[in-house]
């Protein structure tokens, strides 16, 4: 470590217990920046690894949704909030929120780029690993009432060596209340569900499923599935693959949508745009996720039961990252260490999700347990 003059010492609030404590960290490098603020990598004194520090400007008119939600949730495939603190600049009358977060070395976007630059495809097993962990995180998140609203490759942190994935960036996340409207211009364009493109303000967590499906397709293709440069172009891209939605489908997505003059585009099929390494099971799963009517779109917990993931349920399955030199094989990262809250989401699906060889390692008897009501995140956000 360099000299102590680079250290920043702060009184922070623990992200789990709420207790105050003093920590010191040394900023290392900028990981990302944008309208939201900046994220840096830092070395936390007294620990062997790194953390990420996210600094965002506070709007005094609102509680910070991201902080509220991150304090309310906890999951192996969601980035952990270690601690947080506020800073105030009197001269500018500005307050910033600083989140100290678990650090991961890359994003799914970075991993994809490594392969595409070498004109290679991400191995199917890696796609299955990333997809399973993403939908496991979403199944838990949705069970708490929270919708992420910005699923994209840049918000999926990974360690390609171990295959572990964690969902991050809850800056757009919100507890969805059925009776309350939401903004429709949410989510990065390539990953926006069609009901959002049609301007719906009453939508469900199924928008995350659509976005995640777009990410899975992109992992196979190596580029975005629906790369629209505007809202109209986004709709054209979707119609080009899935065909024109019927008036009934449009009215279900947004009953208030009145402009029924849709682009006249000659449709392809999903099969025609997906590469040869996209298996029959993968194609079937994509079809179940990429449907216009949200209620017909498969849910995140249901996705986990799909045969596409059966290879991961094989106790002899080993993970080999083709980015590694040599032929290092590793055991899969923990995929089935479901806690009681996860087992309680849809108890009737547990045996379709979890392979028999993990039953004994669970904290509960999968054949005889009392499901709990999953704690809902605070909607006052």
Swiss-Prot record:
GO molecular function: ATP binding; protein serine kinase activity; protein serine/threonine kinase activity; protein serine/threonine/tyrosine kinase activity
Any one Pfam family match given in the protein's UniProt record, by short name: Pkinase
Enzyme kind, highest EC tier: transferase
Keyword flag Kinase: yes
Residues bearing the modification Phosphotyrosine: 185
Record-listed Phosphoserine modification sites: 184
Catalytic residues (positions): 150
GO biological process: cell differentiation; protein catabolic process; signal transduction; SREBP signaling pathway
Domain of life: Eukaryota
Catalytic activity: L-seryl-[protein] + ATP = O-phospho-L-seryl-[protein] + ADP + H(+); L-threonyl-[protein] + ATP = O-phospho-L-threonyl-[protein] + ADP + H(+)
Similarity section: Belongs to the protein kinase superfamily. CMGC Ser/Thr protein kinase family. GSK-3 subfamily.
Protein known as: Protein kinase gsk31
Species: Schizosaccharomyces pombe (strain 972 / ATCC 24843) (Fission yeast)
